[in-house]
Amino acid sequence: MQTPLEVIGLSKVYDKKKAVKDISFKVNKNEIIGILGPNGCGKTTTIGMILGLLKPTSGKVLINGIEIEKKRVELLNNLNFISPYVELPKKLTVKQNLIVYGKLYDVKNLKSKIEYLSEKLRLEEIINKITGELSSGQKNRVSLAKSIINDPPVLLLDEPTASLDPETGDFVRSFLEDYQKEKETSILLASHNMSEVERLCSSVLMMNSGTIIDQGSTEKLIKKHGRKNME
């Protein structure tokens, strides 16, 4: 069986400064791997390179054993992304947003899928509202719905609960737990929230200054480094 996501020797240099330095890791099927580290450590740059939004200075990204740089269009349905920092089209309704993304990924039974996601993510009351008028928590749930509308085998999460109130953040984490178990999705979660990583991830990569400084289970790393030093 091919590995859903593999990163090999990935580096990114900006103006002679290395933002990411020769990192390698795998995310196996039905596994959630966390990247934990402070702001500026290279988490978002790493995700940007995996998505193809940033061109690596060196190294490669494989999806199911295929180098994504060479087969990006063919691999479109295998990979999706969630981030609170990516804006949704503001003038479309929630339903229109989901229809656009569903058609982009050629989702079968799109109407049923939108109804399912609306129920699971509590979107029924806002389904016909203009996206630009929604609260940050509502936008977060819409972003989550559009990113999983095609049930991608690999999902990248960049600070998925950032700026959410505790109740909404807990709801999103609970949904992700249930969804991942049901679909056996391979997830890479970038966060600086230790509690979030501990709850969701089976293994963690600790990043600092663009490098992976340690990796292992959350239990092992907490014992080794101390919770305070990992937050």
Name each model feature, range by range.
Residues 59-70, 74-75:
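Conserved ABC transporter NBD signature motif
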Residues 99, 103-126:
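Conserved ABC ATPase "signature" region
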Residues 130-134:
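Conserved ABC ATPase signature
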Residues 155-159:
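Catalytic Walker B motif of ABC-type/P-loop ATPase nucleotide-binding domains
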Residues 170-183:
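Helical segment within the ABC ATPase nucleotide-binding domain
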Residues 215-216:
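ABC ATPase "signature
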